[in-house]
């Protein structure tokens, strides 16, 4: 889970 997608 990337920072821009959570």
Swiss-Prot record:
4-hydroxyproline modification sites? 3
Give compartment(s): Secreted
A GO term (biological process) for this protein?
A: defense response
Tissue occurrence: Expressed by the skin glands.
Keyword Lipid metabolism among record annotations: no
A cellular-component GO term for this protein: extracellular region
Question: Sorted alphabetically, which keywords does the UniProt record give?
Answer: Amidation, Amphibian defense peptide, Hydroxylation, Secreted
As stated in the Swiss-Prot or TrEMBL entry, residues carrying the post-translational modification Leucine amide are 6
Q: Which domain of life is it from?
A: Eukaryota
Q: Family assignment?
A: Belongs to the frog skin active peptide (FSAP) family. Tryptophillin subfamily.
Q: What is this protein called?
A: Tryptophyllin-T2-6
The species this protein was found in: Pithecopus azureus (Orange-legged monkey tree frog)
């Amino acid at each position: 889970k990337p920072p821009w997608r959570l």
